[in-house]
Amino acid sequence: MLPFVFNMSNVDNQNKPASVRVHFKLSTDSFIYSLSTTIQGIVEESLRFNKETIMHRKGATLAYGTSKTRITAPLFPALRFLASGSIDEKSPINRAFSFLSNIAYVNANTHSYLAKSFQNKSSYDVMVEKSHQIRSVLKEYNSFPEYEIVADMDKNNKKQYFMKMYSGDHLFVLPFSFASQGMKDQSFILSILLSLPENGVLVIDEIETALHPLSIMNFIDLVVKKNIQMVFTSHNTYILSRLRPDNVFFAYWKDGFSTYRRLSDIYPNIREVNNIEKMYLSSTFDEAIEGD
């Protein structure tokens, strides 16, 4: 579980907690998971289930139901602690933990990731595992070649990776190291997406560093088709034309902190038919975005 990344510019201010709150629904049930922590440890943590607080942690003290206990590891989440001791998969604790632990995080710029489906597997092995599905997806892309990724053992019992390129009736086999960076990035992100369960969450930092603008549009369509929620950052204004106004947030960085403004709050009457990209580039939203 990666609730957030520490803002390293504020490491000296160790006593000021950073907080995250996640609202989500599973079937007809609503959950709110909250976490506040400093670099020294978790300060407070809670889980609300259908408006009732069923778990609350303050420092090392954890209250759950009618019992209280202590958690000695300062950075160990109470939700994980309780889920590890429960065998009832339908309990609110296990349902919440399963949902949150299946959130996949990808930094497309550095190719770093945190995804449950990739535990104990290399990214190459997961790409091979999802290769047939990736090829099926690429058939729907007009701007990307069709290929598969396969693995084989050489005479020294070392795993080698290859790329099968399809062009009409022709098949070409090349070492995967020959693949363009765009192909590698596309395969990597698609394999993570295809590994997520339905209603999963995918968080991508700087999506345009891994995907061509046209491929991003195809990727968003696939996310919608698979019923996955995607949270991503981007500097590419072209993407604004594909998103609903209430799903767009603008980030403004100042003095080491970022603030966020929802587009539909800035401009309540805006609709998808408006040219949001043009409005943004013409500085229509600047005053509201940069305001305190």
Regions found by a protein language model. Name each.
Residues M1-N7, Q186-I192, T233:
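Phosphate-binding glycine-rich loops of NTP-binding sites
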Residues R21, D29-A151:
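Electropositive, glycine-dotted interaction segments
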Residues S30-I32, L171-L174, S258:
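Short, mixed charged/polar active-site loops
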